[in-house]
UniProtKB/Swiss-Prot annotation:
Function, as annotated: Catalyzes the first step in hexosamine metabolism, converting fructose-6P into glucosamine-6P using glutamine as a nitrogen source.
Naturally occurring in which organism (per UniProt): Methanocaldococcus jannaschii (strain ATCC 43067 / DSM 2661 / JAL-1 / JCM 10045 / NBRC 100440) (Methanococcus jannaschii)
Cross-referenced SUPFAM superfamilies: Hedgehog/intein (Hint) domain (SSF51294), Homing endonucleases (SSF55608), lambda repressor-like DNA-binding domains (SSF47413), N-terminal nucleophile aminohydrolases (Ntn hydrolases) (SSF56235), SIS domain (SSF53697)
Protein name: Glutamine--fructose-6-phosphate aminotransferase [isomerizing]
Keywords, in A-Z order: Aminotransferase, Autocatalytic cleavage, Cytoplasm, DNA-binding, Glutamine amidotransferase, Protein splicing, Repeat, Transferase
Family, similarity comment: In the C-terminal section; belongs to the SIS family. GFAT subfamily.
Amino acid sequence: MCGIIGYIGNDKAPKILLNGLRRLEYRGYDSCGIGVVDNNKLIIKKNVGKVEEVAKKERFLDIDGNIGIGHCLHPDTYVILPDGRMKKISEIDEDEVLSVNFEDLKLYNKKIKKFKHKAPKILYKIKTAFSELITTGEHKLFVVENGKIVEKCVKDLNGSELIGVVRKLNYSFNDNVEFKDVYVERHYKLDETIRNKLRKVREKLGLTRKDVEKLCGVKEIYIVKIETGKLESIEEERLKKLCSLYGINFEEIIYRDNLHYTNPVKFPKTPTPELMQIIGYIIGDGHFPSNRMLRLKDERKEVLEEYNQLFKTVFNLEGNIKKGDGNYYILEINSKYLIDWFRENIPELFNKTGNERTPEFVFRLNNDLVASYLRGIFDAEGYIRAEAKQIGIGMTSKCFIKEIQFLLLRFGILASYSKIKRKEENWNNTHKLLISDKKSFELFKKYIGFTAKDKMEKLEAILNKMKGLNFRYISIPLTKKEIREFVGVPLKTIKNGDNYCTDYTIEKIIEELNSKGLYDKAEYLKRFLDADIVWTKFKIEEVESDVEYVYDLEVEDYHNFIGNLIINHNSRWATHGNVCKENAHPHTDCKEEIAVVHNGIISNYKELKDELMKKGHKFKSETDTEVVPHLIEEELKKFKEINEENYIKAVKNAIKKLKGTYALVIINKNFPNLLIGARNESPLILGINDDGYFLGSDITAFLDYTNKAIPLEDGDVVVIKKKENGYEVTIENNGNTVEREMMEINWDISSAEKMGYPHFMLKEIMEQPEVLKVSAKISAEEIKELAKCIKDYDRVYFVAMGTSLHAAMVVEYLFAKLGKLVIACDASEFLNKGVVDDKTLVIGITQSGETYDTLKALRFAKKNKAKTGAIVNVLGSTATREADITVMMGAGIEIAVCATKTYTSQLMILYRLFIEYGKLLGRDMSEYEKEIDKIPNYIKEVLDKKETIKEIANNLKVNNYIFISKGINIASALEGALKFKEITYLHAEGMSGGLLKHGTISLIDENMDTVAIVPPRDSAVFNSILSNIEEVKARGGKVIAITPTEIDGAENILVPEVIEEISPIVYAPAFQLLAYYKAVELGRDVDKPRGLAKSVTVE
């Protein structure tokens, strides 16, 4: 449920509960219900539907009664994501991680949910040879105990168990990485023939050198030097200007006269093995003394000679190698353009010592490219110790070392981690990785290796002497004794013992079992040997918490994830049930004496439910909430006498067993004078008036009755007792009675519903990051089905009106990129110009699902045997019933007439439709898919500029505005103008920048402001819109630029630099806020503009 309310007092509970549910309905409901104690009977009324619909159907107000209700790990833990990146659990915003299937011991991508909890005072540190993990005592790990893989709480570990760690990462990668070019000013070498040609053409045209300067800007003195040979070369731009003035074809002079430029540096478009090796070495031991020089150093001259050749291959640049002051050589590469290119594409190369990081794109690359990157790092900082039989690397950046450790796992190379504390003052600690087992040595040699010949010779020599001995990890978590018992026959390879086998021994056992014909036994052991995980010993200690919050994940299916290489158990994947009467709140116990409403998620509900079912409890729903009344019922059984005091204790004991986020309100028919509430990370507010007390998930629930409230805090349990002469209210936290400050709310109902924002429109604009997270996932199968229809049908129309039509215009551009013609059509004109038959697909976009013209277009299409689809926000609307395929947007209720969050939600759905269509064509759409999860953060960046936008809006003084853009953002210009005029009541017109010269530019002066929506810098129309801006400025027009880059002479609203395909989504909040703040400044009715309705249901 989206909101809950409880009441105890002298008034009729059903009336107050119904009113509270009505007030909370703006949050969105799919079902609702109430529970009331009347004459010691618990009466539950609930069903699927809107509040009024359910209240009427279930006859809420027929009930009497005066009491009722209406509906971890340390944050620095690194988790492995499916694309190979590692990310702190506290920073994860992805929806999948890698999880272990203990059936085949392999890793798979699984969906997750993340939870944050208050950290206890004491945590536990688990230390293995490979990593450390800091966690709460209640957190579970997968361990081996007595030869079996079991789940065990950290606080119960004794150190004799084995913990699972990752040995190899297998996942799909996407190396579709493209680098940006940087400007390189070319200088062309001129011979005497070209000099004379330029001079003769000038003279033939009758131009003096002074004339040339005036006409094209090339200085007279420069022309003298070129023609007389005092300058041996000429810059490309100046040569182009002269050619243009002289009427000479620039390309022709370059190729026919065989001109060569003197600085022929080249830049790669995509990663190559040679480039990745260079990048690895620079991060390891590179240095930029200036903005035009790079230095590498090494003890071995031949290594630098090899890297000099790599620079020649990749960049067409050669450096100089010289002897350094010590026992090393230096390779210097001098090129400003090379440094510019590195700074533009790989800024991580410029991190200071101690802050080294792997460029993020590296994690997306294929293994060949990653191997080259690692080779460069190990060339720079790696070493071999022949005596210790170890390959090692040490750096002062812990994060970078961890990244190397993760990347090595791609190849099955397991490296142990250690931290060396430096005794010297002001010296950073060193973080080291050591590779010491034979299997990892072999894989390192095969995939990575060293450039230095002597290092490779040492590696070979060590390998020749090594056996398959591994003392830091165990591949098969069975002792020798347990292995002999498992195979059931005598083995020559091993004798009974309580120790574990090395890989070398396991290989010998497998050979022996195969020779005996015990192939199934051999295959079972080989499965462990080839697994993605191994097992290791550990140490454990208690430590004081140094953080306020700890984190946990819910992982579907396998219920585990990788944290700091260690396999962690999770809070079970919560199934909260479908929309049905059984799953509606309130929920009751077996005897139907206790009723509970709940907001949030009980993350350990599955374990609790399993335990309760074993004890005979019968569940009626699929929800997590239902465990609460059953748990209270079970706790009550522990008391010989059931009285008020013991009931309260039972409730508190039950609450202690809950994990997750919750706001609970609880009643019991046997104790009609008690109302109990509990809060943990989900809002719950206590309302107070003379006739009773309220509990609500927000103030709106009871603001009609009182403005006095106490916001409860995490861990609070409130007990409200109704007595003959008044009420007794107790708030406890961790068993201690606490006082909470009462506040008087000055909001009216409208302000409360707006969550304190002055208008619904602003609230809905600010909700967009969260809304888009829903729109990014909803209706996945329906979108795939609609994409297939687009592929199968000859003609495709998107019909819509107003804001929805602008969204449809965006989709025209998206599908054009994939070679598919789709038509965005004004639904009111579709009957006049639509060409419709049984080979036609017509998709209606309508927020309400009730837009008259859009429904009329869909009905016209069906009448002519076309296939129909609808992209809709309101479930159960007319459009959902009439279309063949319905795609829900998931934007939630939008109250303001002016569409904001529903527009960006529509764009997200259409962007996903574009991606699915591309996949059907066999295109690689992975880069586009990755942008989906980034969009909410991009939107947040724009929303963070709201004060800047407000200031700009308040400085707009004219009554006429033009919104311009080009390409896909023409739709943004049209939508921006629509937003502006519909709530400011000022004239605003949106158009393509290309139309300015076709009449509109004559209107530009100091009384006409222009809002320019500037596309991303890599857009083909970026320079064109800049030209439009200059045209406006030249005529005295003021320019407001919504832009990813500063525009001189304009008032800039800076937005993130994104790919062009998602820019209409990212830019939208900027012009929405601009319109909003200007309308507020003018005193307009922002939420209900004059003459407009939320849904146009008439012609």
